[in-house]
Amino acid sequence: MTIAEKIRKIAADARQASLAMARLSSAAKNELLMNMAMALINNTPHLVEENAKDLSAGEKKGLSAAMLDRLMLDEARIKAMADGLREVVGLPDPVGEVTRMWKRPNELTVGKMRIPLGVIGIIYESRPNVTADAAALCLKAGNAVVLRGGSEAIYSNVAIARILQDEMRKDGIPVAALSVIPFVEREGVTEMLKQEEFIDVIIPRGGESLIRFVVEHSKIPVIKHYKGVCHVFVDASADFDMAERIIVNSKTQRPGVCNALETLLIHKDVAETFIPRIFETLAALKVEMRGDDCFRQFAPGATPATEEDWHAEYLDLILAARVVDDMDEAIAHINKYGSLHTEAIITSDYGNSQRFLREVNSSVVLVNASTRFSDGNQLGLGAEIGISTTKLHSFGPMGLEDLTTTKFIVYGEGQVRP
C-alpha cells in the first residue's frame, strides 16, 4: 500500500475503534491506564535503547543541545511518563455526565450529556512523552487517537505506542484506538489532514511553522495551540513589590515555555519610578530588555524595540517593554499583538481589574498573578492536552472535559408534536 492508503486505513480503523472506546466503563479505562503505566516502567531499558537511536540521528543532523534534551528519555523521565498516566486515572471521567436538565411546558425533560469527540488527531514535535500523555487523556475521555510525532523522535514514539498497544491488546481493547503514523515523510502529515471522513478534530502542538502548515492544509477542524505572546500590564495603582515579584516569576522561572512573559506594559504615571527598578532587577537576572523610546528614557541600557518585538515569542531571557498612556492603550496593544494566550494586570483598582478581565481577548486573563499559572494543573484541571488559542471548540488549557462534547437527551411519556 502507498502512504496515503496506509494512513486512510489507520484513520478508518481508529473510527471503528472509537465506538468501542465510547462504551468502556470508567473502571476499565482506569485499569488500562494503570497497566500502561506499569508497562512503561517495565520496558525502561527498551525505551532508552530506542531513544538512543533518535539521539544519535539528532546529533548527526546537528540538532541543538536544547532540542536533544527535549528528545532524551532516561529512567527518571520514563517514570514521570508513568506517573502522568496514573495521574489521569485519578481524574473524574467526564463521559456520561449530565451537565444540565430542564423541564419543558409539555412535560418533556431535556438534558445535555457529555460524550467523546470520537477520533482525535494530534500532531506534535520533539518530546516523546507527549505520545503517552496525549494517549492517556484521549483514551480516558473515551476517544480514539491518531498520533503523528516529529521525525526526530520516530523510534521513541513508535516504541512507546507499541508498549501501550500491547496493554490494550491484553485488555481486549482495539489497538486501533491508539495509532502512531509511522512515516517520517511530510506526506504522512498531509495525508492525515485529509481524513475528514474518519478524524473529528486535529490538535497541533509545536512551533509556529507547524501550526500554520496544519491550518493551511487540514480538511479537518483544527484546535490551534498557537504561540504564547503573553503580556503583563503594570497599572498606575500597582503595588511595586507585587509587580516586581510577578514580572520576575513570569519571565524567568521557565523562559522557554508558552506561558512565559514576553511583553511588559507600564502605565505612564509610574514609568519614572518603576522602570529603573524593574530594569535593574531583570538585568541582574540576565534578561535583555527591548524598550520603546519612553521606556528607554528611564532605562538607557535597554535595546530599542522594533515592530517585530511586539509580535515575538522569544522563549528566552528577552523581554519587550512599552510605556502606555492608559488602560485603553494597554488593552488595544494586547488585543492587536497578543496571541490569545495569557495576559495579566497588576493593579489595586477593582474597576480596572474587572475591565481588563472583560475586554482582553485572550484565553487566560489574570489579576495580580503570574502568567505561569496558565496551566491545566495549576488551574485545577489536572493533566492537559495543551493550551488552545482557538475559541472553537475549547479556549485555554484543555483538560479531560475539553476532549468531550455534549449531546441532548430527552425523556418523554408518549408526547407527540402537535
Swiss-Prot record:
Pathway membership: Amino-acid biosynthesis; L-proline biosynthesis; L-glutamate 5-semialdehyde from L-glutamate: step 2/2
UniProt subcellular location: Cytoplasm
UniProt keyword annotation of NADP present: yes
Enzyme class (EC, first level): oxidoreductase
Origin superkingdom: Bacteria
Keyword NADP: yes
Catalytic function, reaction form: L-glutamate 5-semialdehyde + phosphate + NADP(+) = L-glutamyl 5-phosphate + NADPH + H(+)
InterPro entries: Ald_DH/histidinol_DH, Ald_DH_C, Ald_DH_N, Aldehyde_DH_dom, G-glutamylP_reductase_CS, Glu-5-SA_DH, GPR_dom
GO biological process: L-proline biosynthetic process
GO CC, one annotated term: cytoplasm
EC number: 1.2.1.41
PROSITE patterns assigned: PROA
Keyword list, A-Z: Amino-acid biosynthesis, Cytoplasm, NADP, Oxidoreductase, Proline biosynthesis
Function, in words: Catalyzes the NADPH-dependent reduction of L-glutamate 5-phosphate into L-glutamate 5-semialdehyde and phosphate. The product spontaneously undergoes cyclization to form 1-pyrroline-5-carboxylate.
Matches recorded under HAMAP family: ProA
Entry's family note: Belongs to the gamma-glutamyl phosphate reductase family.
Stated name of the protein: Gamma-glutamyl phosphate reductase
Organism listed in the record: Geotalea uraniireducens (strain Rf4)
